[in-house]
Amino acid sequence: MKFKTGDKVRVMRGKDAGKEGQITKVLKDADKVVVEGINMIKKHQKPNNANPQGGIIDKEAPIHVSNVMLLDPDTNKPTRIGSEVKDGNKVRIAKKSGTAIDK
């Protein structure tokens, strides 16, 4: 998985295509990511200590990694992700501009 928590991504397919957000959670086993404010669903919540009223809450649902692309830190356009070894460390790079994503 080439995505990490905190990466800025753009949704390329689906009902939220074109929207941008930050990754809040990475689900490696399912190849999915949770993006802040994207792919919102309504969940019926039973009453509990945290929410004694219960009811319907809005929540972000995971989206498959094939439907999102990382935003290039320089150009702010969608780009693919590559990797290079610099100073003995593996670093993610943006394919379009060649700049390092991990600082």
Swiss-Prot record:
Coiled-coil regions listed in the entry? none
Which InterPro entries does the protein's record reference? KOW (IPR005824), Rib_uL2_dom2 (IPR014722), Ribosomal_uL24 (IPR003256), Ribosomal_uL24_CS (IPR005825), Ribosomal_uL24_KOW (IPR041988), Translation_prot_SH3-like_sf (IPR008991)
S-S bridge residues: none
Source organism superkingdom: Bacteria
What is one process in the GO biological process aspect for this record?
translation
For this record, the Gene Ontology CC terms, alphabetical, are:
ribonucleoprotein complex; ribosome
**Keywords tagged on the record:** Ribonucleoprotein, Ribosomal protein, RNA-binding, rRNA-binding
Alphabetized GO MF terms: rRNA binding; structural constituent of ribosome
Outline what the protein does: One of two assembly initiator proteins, it binds directly to the 5'-end of the 23S rRNA, where it nucleates assembly of the 50S subunit. One of the proteins that surrounds the polypeptide exit tunnel on the outside of the subunit.
Q: Which family does it belong to?
A: Belongs to the universal ribosomal protein uL24 family.
Assembly, in brief, is:
Part of the 50S ribosomal subunit.
User: What name has this protein been given in UniProt?
Assistant: Large ribosomal subunit protein uL24
Q: Which organism is it from?
A: Lacticaseibacillus paracasei (strain ATCC 334 / BCRC 17002 / CCUG 31169 / CIP 107868 / KCTC 3260 / NRRL B-441) (Lactobacillus paracasei)
